A protein has these predicted regions:
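Extreme N-terminal leader/targeting segments of oxidoreductases
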Residues: 1-29, 47-48, 456, 468, ...
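N-terminal glycine-rich phosphate/pyrophosphate-binding loop and immediately adjacent elements
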Residues: 13-152, 455
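Short beta-strand to alpha-helix junction loop
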Residues: 89, 169-183, 223-245, 254-256, ...
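Mid-domain catalytic core of redox enzymes
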Residues: 260-380, 518
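C-terminal segments that line or cap access tunnels to active or ligand-binding sites in enzymes
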Residues: 336-438
Length: 524
């Protein structure tokens, strides 16, 4: 079959996205960056009737939600699980349906798996009651504490949804706002293994439990049981579906288009200088617009794109004091002659220490994920894709030899993986790895940060940069702004900005729908 004859959701089908036409001189809105936040805000604005340009510096759309191909294998560049998006009863799932996004989703069950230093493991069911029953069977002496903990998690989930996703103040959130996951676990439990189990997926935050918000962790914890999904065809299919919808609404998506400067005058943004074209034929163009939305790295926006005279030095200093989330080392492996059952056995987080606060050092060996267990077409017939992920607490600026740094991490990962998979070398068909610098090179995220600013209590809410910029007509979407990092918060930031620009709540549904979303599907 020819590539052009493949269905749109096939992971091997090329993405014919991005007009080859250069940007026009004027738009109603220009979005800098085609990550998920940039794509969603572009769709919402185009749907509202605005003339919109999305300028993306990479040659594909999606940011961290993209894929690449090697020898017939398709690999997710970074993001590989998508809570809520396949559930039409949730805020983001309903939005995708309302926008006509055709992506199909595979529900992941089990949600996750944890391997402990004592050789035992725990599998997280997608059913909340089953999950809690297994916890109580494993830790009967903590049964009462588990009930108390999850009662609190439900309450915090609801309050956090109202505050961080609906911008509604509540005095009932105050006792929890400054609390870390570590503090909550220590308050409820004594058993160190149970504490690790309940923090065992903390690497997805890119921060240790002692610096991770209990509120945000509670929101993600319960979202798993409303549905954790993988896109049919892989991450790029989801990004491409968004991009195609944007173009169908009349939007102009321009790839290989780097935002160089945001033009400002008298405290307002009025345009963007964009560099377009192939590497040896780059051209800088000025594009005028009523509204500018940055989906890029916030410090780069301040340092490289805005005139220092147009920003408050104290505000910029506050941004500089924020801590980015940890970067992640990734190894993408195309394999043959390995059974799905073996991959199921070894998938999940592998912990070598009971100290989850050392997650970015030596406590976490790695996480193993196999997308072909959900979407077999990511590999040639008979093949499997395996992704190794390891968060790293590191001094990015002092790495002097990135190739050697990456090679050392890759060798260590393979040595440890060989202890789990016999004859590993024989089974590997192709391998590609990515360091923090790789993540930076393709996405321009500060130091390769996984999720923008760290989701610590002091960096959420008023402690996180708001979606409105330091000058009029400038807005931010994505994980460097409110409400935070992760696929749902990123989409919520886009919904918020679209609402502000169009001066209409229609961008996120009717008031009645918003009320339902505030209490959507909290597990009983």
């Amino acid at each position: 079959m020819k590539l052009s004859e493949l269905p749109d959701d096939h992971p091997q089908k090329p993405a014919y996205l991005g007009r080859r036409l250069p940007p026009e001189e004027r738009y109603d809105a220009v979005v800098i960056g085609a990550g998920i936040g940039g794509l969603v805000v572009g769709i919402l604005l185009a749907k509202a009737g605005l003339k919109v340009l999305i300028a993306e510096q990479h040659y594909v759309a999606g940011g961290y939600c993209s894929t690449f191909r090697r020898k017939g294998y398709v690999f997710d560049s970074a993001t590989h699980f998508y809570p809520l998006l396949g559930n039409e009863e949730t805020i983001t799932g309903r939005l995708l349906k309302d926008l006509g996004i055709p992506t199909r989703w595979v529900k992941m069950d089990p949600v996750d798996q944890f391997h402990f230093p004592d050789g035992s493991r725990f599998t997280v069911s997608a059913d909340f009651d089953t999950y809690v029953a297994r916890l109580k069977a494993e830790f009967p002496e903590e049964a009462g504490a588990l009930d108390g903990f999850f009662n609190e998690v439900r309450r915090v989930y609801y309050l956090g949804l109202l505050h961080y996703f609906r911008w509604r103040e509540s005095e009932h959130l105050e006792p929890y706002r400054a609390q870390t996951l570590r503090q909550a676990l220590d308050r409820h439990f004594r058993n160190p293994k149970l504490k690790l189990l309940l923090a065992a997926d903390v690497p997805h935050w890119g921060s240790p439990p002692e610096r991770t918000s209990f509120v945000f962790d509670s929101m993600l914890r319960l979202s798993y049981f409303l549905g954790n999904y993988y896109p049919v065809g892989g991450s790029q299919v989801f990004a491409d579906d968004l991009a195609r919808r944007f173009e169908a609404l009349g939007g102009h998506l321009c790839l290989r288009a780097l935002g160089r400067k945001i033009l400002t005058e008298n405290g307002r943004a009025y345009g963007v200088e964009i560099e377009t074209g192939l590497p040896l034929r780059r051209v800088r163009r000025t594009v005028l617009a009523e509204k500018i939305i940055s989906n890029g790295d916030l410090l780069r926006t301040y340092d490289e794109m805005l005139d220092p005279g147009e920003t408050d030095p104290d505000a910029v200093a506050e941004v500089r004091r924020l801590r980015p989330s940890m970067p992640c080392f990734l190894a993408h492996i195309g394999m043959r002659d390995i059974s799905g059952e073996m991959l199921d056995d070894i998938s999940g987080y592998h912990w070598d220490s009971w100290d989850s606060d050392a997650v970015g050092q030596s406590a976490l060996r790695f996480k193993i994920f196999s997308p072909t267990r959900f979407e077999p077409r990511m590999a040639p017939e008979g093949g499997q894709v395996l992704i190794i992920q390891r968060v790293r607490e590191m001094d990015y600026d002092n790495v002097v030899d990135w190739p050697s740094h990456k090679a050392a991490l890759e060798a260590d990962a393979l040595t440890r993986l060989a202890a789990l998979i016999p004859d590993l070398d024989r089974r590997i068909v192709v391998m590609s790895s990515a360091s923090a610098q790789t993540s930076y090179r393709y996405t321009l995220n500060l130091k390769g940060a996984m999720l923008g600013w760290e989701m610590s209590p002091d960096q959420l809410g008023s402690g996180r940069p708001e979606v409105t910029g330091p000058v009029d007509n400038l807005y931010f979407v994505g994980h460097w702004t409110r409400p935070g990092g992760g696929i749902t918060p990123v989409i919520v930031s886009a919904m918020r900005v679209a609402e502000l620009i169009t001066a209409s709540p229609a961008a996120i549904g009717s008031g009645r729908a918003r009320g339902r979303a505030a209490a959507e599907g909290v597990p009983p």
